[in-house]
Amino acid sequence: MKGGVKICKSGGVRFGMIILGKYNVPLYPNSGITFQNRGGEIVFRGECSIGNASVISVGEKGHIDIGANFSATTSLKLVSFHKITFEENVLIGWNNTICDTDFHQLTLVESTNIIPAYAPVLIRKNCWLAQNCIVQKGTELPSYCVAATNSLLNKKYGIPSKSLIAGQPAVLKKTGIYRDCKNDKVIY
């Protein structure tokens, strides 16, 4: 493994602050985590828990910046060959894929201009990506937003904070809504 891992947290580092491969959900195999770094960098800015059956892959020039209180339940596929940034308090549900590259560039027929194969991804603070979301290059999600199950995020979302997006591709469905993690207990 090449590359680097940095921990930047005021107040110091403590045992158990970063947990990778945690067995959270028995619906997925307890296979830990696959971690591949080809020379890039991962920065942890506080507590982080990434569940079992997950993969982190960082390319030679890739950069992943994970804000404090990051949580991904299980089977996260996180691939960076450019730049992915998560601000603080981001929650990721089951089986999400977040990738800042297509791995292939495309050429426009009319002009022969090339569409870049990569672009940064930015998930701002207090966002929640429900299960089975795909986040593609160039995605930017405002603070306190929710991406519904099976959503495809593929652009800079110029929407208000505290909005719900859904669909393939994801579009604005509702404003004035967010997940309050301090009041999130469901009683069945």
Report residues per predicted region.
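Domain-scale signature associated with acetyltransferase and cell-envelope carbohydrate enzymes
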Residues: 1-99, 120-126, 132-138, 143, ...
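A short acidic, glycine-rich active-site loop
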Residues: 112-121
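Short alpha-helix at the nucleotide-sugar/activated-sugar donor binding site of glycosyltransferases
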Residues: 146-147
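Conserved metal-binding segment of the jelly-roll/cupin
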Residues: 150
